């Protein structure tokens, strides 16, 4: 692994600054980082972390409280463009995998130590193979398994809210 460090974001101003940068990026989900929307979500985050390499923020994401003792890890994951995996660059010039190597293990340990059940999700059925691969690559001690169905993680009228779920238990209240 590269020499990266996870740091907690404790101030809303720093978080919103990162969201503003992400919302202006070419990230496919840039609209998900809208500052006004993220400001409204701030109080539902139990922890927000960033991945740092030197002075550079590589990525950020949070642990979002879904209620009923359930949290979503790597919520609103943002990865800087040069660190994103691209199907055109299978050789991967940048071997840093923020979700797999850092955020999912760190945030899951943080949440399970506090008694929460965890999940993470990926949109659309066509990304199920990627979700299966990611779940297999995680350390077994984290306890993740890919659940058999698609689940509504937000407004079911929005097709992007129906997602593949990997969770630390088989039955989650979604």
Question: Regions from the language model: what does each represent?
Answer:
Residues 15-18, 74, 99, 103:
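Residue-level preference for hydrophobic side chains embedded in well-ordered alpha helices
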Residues 109-125:
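Conserved GNAT acetyl-CoA-binding A-motif
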Residues 20-81:
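A conserved beta-strand-loop-helix scaffold within acyl/acetyltransferase catalytic domains
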Residues 142-174:
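C-terminal "cap" of GNAT-fold acetyltransferases
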Residues 120-136, 154:
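Conserved beta-strand-loop-alpha-helix junction that forms the acyl-donor binding cleft
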